[in-house]
């Protein structure tokens, strides 16, 4: 539960704390290819989650999907807004942090429920 609730967000948090403030012009320059990579993560994470028969793996792949949505939002505002556009940057950061927090709570609760079901039934499929 700790892995999905906290550790999976560390890369995105590091991006927000290091890359965004130090390299805003470069981020604006490379935002379009990064947008495509994030969109690929959204699509591939969703399809990988749909193919799973194990519930824990399904939640893990949907976590990849949700974190790709966060990256997609950040790269979209980096592509659309200039680095000096304070209102768009604050809105994107606030929305991304809220999504990260909500995903941490919901994914942890889902893994807790899956563990309970596994204990009660003995199977995850």
What are the residue ranges of the model-derived segments?
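Hydrophobic transmembrane alpha-helices and their helix-loop junctions in integral membrane proteins
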Residues: 1-125
């Amino acid at each position: 539960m700790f892995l999905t609730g906290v550790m999976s967000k560390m890369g995105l948090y590091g991006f927000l704390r290091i890359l965004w403030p130090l390299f805003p012009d470069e981020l604006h320059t490379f935002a379009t290819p990064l947008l495509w990579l994030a969109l690929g993560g959204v699509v591939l994470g969703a399809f990988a989650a749909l193919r799973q028969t194990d519930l824990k793996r399904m939640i893990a792949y949907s976590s990849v999907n949700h974190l790709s949505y966060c990256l997609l939002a950040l790269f979209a505002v980096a592509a659309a807004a200039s680095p000096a556009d304070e209102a768009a940057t604050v809105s994107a950061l606030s929305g991304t942090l809220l999504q990260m927090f909500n995903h941490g709570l919901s994914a942890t609760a889902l893994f807790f429920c899956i563990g309970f079901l596994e204990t009660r039934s003995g199977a995850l499929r």
